[in-house]
C-alpha cells in the first residue's frame, strides 16, 4: 500500500482503538474518542490583487476538551483535507496528554498553496479564516498555533483580527507568535529540540552512542532544521538529508563525513533547495531511506514511510518528528524487525509543550528566559519518554502503543470524572 492510499483519519482511529483494546477500556471510551467533538468548515472569500474574488476552503477540528481547551496548529497547504485535520486533532489530544499539559486536541487548515499568494493576499486570507471561526476559539476554548507553511507573522495577523472582532486584548488566543508580540523565547526551536532530546534518550536505551551516531533526516523546514542543529549539538552526524522542491519533486543528498546543518540552512535560504549543496552527492529517495545510519528522522508530511520503505531501513531507531509519517503496515514491519520507533505524539511534543508555556506566560504576563524554557521543556520530554518506555517494557508493546496507552488512560479518567460515561 502506498502512502497516498492511506486515510490518515482511519489510521488515527485504528491507533486509538488498538490502545483502548490493549488497556481493556470500556467501549464508551473509544466511542467518545473516535470522532472530533466539533469540525468547522468555512468558505473564505479573498480579494485578490487583481481585484477578483477567490474563495478558499478552511477547516478547524476540535477533538476533545475533557482535560482543557483544545490546542493545535493551522496549516496552509494544497493537500489539506477535512479528514487530515480530524486525524491531526486526534493526535494532538494524545500529544498534549503525553507530556501532561492541560489541553485537548485541535487542528486547522486551509486548502491553498501559499507560494502563489502575495503578502497582501496571504494577510487577507489569514484574517478571513479567523472571521470564520472566531466565535468558536479563545484562550480558554481553543488555542491555534503555526503549522505547515504558517509562521509568527500569520499568527500575529490572526490575533489582531480576533481582538478586533471580539473587542478584547487577548494575545493568548494563539501561540507561536513573535517574541515582540507575546511569543515565548525558545518556541521557534522547541519542536526540533524536543526531537533531539527524544532521539538521545531512545539511543541511550538501545546502546547507540549519540556522539558517534549517523543520522538521516527527511525535511529541512522548521522542525527538520532545528532537529539537525540540536542533534549536532549532542554530537550526532547528519549524513543524509531528503527534501522536496517544485522542479525536482523529492530528492536526497548524502555525505558520509556529515552535512553541516547551518551551512545547509544558509544554502537553502539562498538557493531554495539543496540540489547542488557543496560536498554532497545526490542520491535517490530509496537510497536515502536505506542509507547506513543509526537513526532515521522523518520530519516532512504524513505517510512518508510505507511498508516498502520500512523494509529497506537499516537504522535501529526511527524518531517521528513529523505527524503521522509512518503507515500502519510500516509500523508492523518495524515491530517484526525489532526497530524501535518513537511516535509523533511523543517525539514532536516539544512544540506544543512550549506553546503551553507561551500561553501560561501570556495569561500571567510574566516571561521566562530562553534557558528556563529549554530546561522546562527538556524535563517534560524526558519524563514523558521514561513513562512511555516503562509501559513499553511492562506490557511488551511498541512505543506507539505505549504512548497511546499512557495518554488515553489520562484522558479517559478526565472524561469519567466529568460524567461523560
Swiss-Prot record:
- What PROSITE patterns does the record point to? GLFV_DEHYDROGENASE (PS00074)
Q: Which transformation does this protein catalyse, written as a reaction?
A: L-glutamate + NAD(+) + H2O = 2-oxoglutarate + NH4(+) + NADH + H(+)
What are the positions of the active site? 107
Binding residues for substrate: 71, 95, 355
Under the heading SMART domains, the entry gives: ELFV_dehydrog
**Keyword Transcription regulation listed:** no
* Gene Ontology biological process terms, A to Z: amino acid metabolic process; glutamate catabolic process
* EC number of this enzyme: 1.4.1.2
Q: Which CDD domains match?
A: NAD_bind_1_Glu_DH
Pfam families annotated for this entry?
A: ELFV_dehydrog, ELFV_dehydrog_N
Q: Which InterPro entries match?
A: Aminoacid_DH-like_N_sf, Glu/Leu/Phe/Val/Trp_DH, Glu/Leu/Phe/Val/Trp_DH_C, Glu/Leu/Phe/Val/Trp_DH_dimer, Glu/Leu/Phe/Val_DH_AS, Glu_DH, NAD(P)-bd_dom_sf, NAD_bind_Glu_DH
Q: Would you say which domain of life the source belongs to? A: Bacteria
Q: Which residues bind NAD(+)?
A: 191, 222
Site residues, Important for catalysis: 147
What terms describe the molecular function in GO for this protein?
Answer: glutamate dehydrogenase (NAD+) activity
Give yes or no: UniProt keyword Oxidoreductase: yes
Q: Which UniProt keywords apply?
A: NAD, Oxidoreductase
Task: Relate the assembly described in the record.
Answer: Homohexamer.
- Enumerate the PANTHER family for this protein: GLUTAMATE DEHYDROGENASE, GLUTAMATE DEHYDROGENASE 1, MITOCHONDRIAL
Name the family the entry cites: Belongs to the Glu/Leu/Phe/Val dehydrogenases family.
Protein name listed in UniProt: NAD-specific glutamate dehydrogenase
- Name of the gene encoding the protein in the UniProt record: gluD
